[in-house]
C-alpha cells in the first residue's frame, strides 16, 4: 500500500480506522447557548482536537517506525557565515544557491574612524 515491505496493509488499515474513530469521538460543539458557553465549548473542543492529533501522531509514528522528534541539523556558528559573491554568481535564477562560505576571521565592515 505505502511501498513498505514486511508491514501488512491490514495493520495499516486498523491503525487508520483507530485514528478515524478518535476524531469521530469528538464531534464539533453545538451552536446552542450563550456566547460564553459556546466559546467555552469551542475552547474545550480545540483542546481535545490537539490531544487527538498528538495521540494520532504518536500512533502513526510508532506504526511507521519514525522518530518522535526530527534529528537536529548541526549548523556552524552564525558569526562565521558570510555571503561572498566575488566569484561568478550567475544571473539566471541560480543566484544565492550553493554552500555557505565560512571565513576564519570575520572582516570588519567599517573600521573605527572610517566614513562612508
Swiss-Prot record:
KW RNA-binding (keyword) present: yes
Disordered, as annotated region: 25-49, 92-116
Alphabetical keyword list: AIDS, Host cytoplasm, Host nucleus, Host-virus interaction, Methylation, mRNA transport, Phosphoprotein, RNA-binding, Transport
Gene3D superfamilies membership: 6.10.140.630
Motif Nuclear export signal and binding to XPO1 per UniProt: ranges: 73-84
UniProt PTM: Asymmetrically arginine dimethylated at one site by host PRMT6. Methylation impairs the RNA-binding activity and export of viral RNA from the nucleus to the cytoplasm.
Compartment annotation: Host nucleus, Host nucleolus; Host cytoplasm
The keyword RNA-binding belongs to this UniProt entry's keyword annotation: yes
Modified residues (Phosphoserine): 5, 8, 92, 99
Motif extent (Nuclear localization signal and RNA-binding (RRE)): 34-50
Region (Homomultimerization): 18-26
InterPro entries tied to this protein: REV_protein
GO biological process, one term: mRNA transport
Compositional bias per record (Basic residues), positions renumbered to this chain: 36-47
HAMAP family (alphabetical): REV_HIV1
Subunit structure: Homomultimer; when bound to the RRE. Multimeric assembly is essential for activity and may involve XPO1. Binds to human KPNB1, XPO1, TNPO1, RANBP5 and IPO7. Interacts with the viral Integrase. Interacts with human KHDRBS1. Interacts with human NAP1; this interaction decreases Rev multimerization and stimulates its activity. Interacts with human DEAD-box helicases DDX3 and DDX24; these interactions may serve for viral RNA export to the cytoplasm and packaging, respectively.
Membership in a protein family: Belongs to the HIV-1 REV protein family.
Domain notes for this protein: The RNA-binding motif binds to the RRE, a 240 bp stem-and-loop structure present in incompletely spliced viral pre-mRNAs. This region also contains the NLS which mediates nuclear localization via KPNB1 binding and, when the N-terminal sequence is present, nucleolar targeting. These overlapping functions prevent Rev bound to RRE from undesirable return to the nucleus. When Rev binds the RRE, the NLS becomes masked while the NES remains accessible. The leucine-rich NES mediates binding to human XPO1.
Misc remark: HIV-1 lineages are divided in three main groups, M (for Major), O (for Outlier), and N (for New, or Non-M, Non-O). The vast majority of strains found worldwide belong to the group M. Group O seems to be endemic to and largely confined to Cameroon and neighboring countries in West Central Africa, where these viruses represent a small minority of HIV-1 strains. The group N is represented by a limited number of isolates from Cameroonian persons. The group M is further subdivided in 9 clades or subtypes (A to D, F to H, J and K).
Protein name: Protein Rev
Gene: rev
Amino acid at each position: 500500500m505505502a511501498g513498505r515491505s514486511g508491514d501488512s496493509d491490514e495493520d495499516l488499515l486498523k491503525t487508520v480506522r483507530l485514528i478515524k474513530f478518535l476524531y469521530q469521538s469528538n464531534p464539533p460543539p453545538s451552536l446552542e447557548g450563550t456566547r460564553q458557553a459556546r466559546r467555552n465549548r469551542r475552547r474545550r473542543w480545540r483542546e481535545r482536537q490537539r490531544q487527538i492529533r498528538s495521540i494520532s501522531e504518536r500512533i502513526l509514528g510508532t506504526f511507521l517506525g519514525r522518530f518522535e522528534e526530527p534529528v537536529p541539523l548541526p549548523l556552524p556558528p552564525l558569526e562565521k557565515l558570510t555571503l561572498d559573491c566575488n566569484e561568478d554568481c550567475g544571473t539566471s535564477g541560480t543566484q544565492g544557491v550553493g554552500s555557505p562560505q565560512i571565513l576564519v576571521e570575520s572582516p570588519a565592515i567599517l573600521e573605527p574612524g572610517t566614513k562612508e
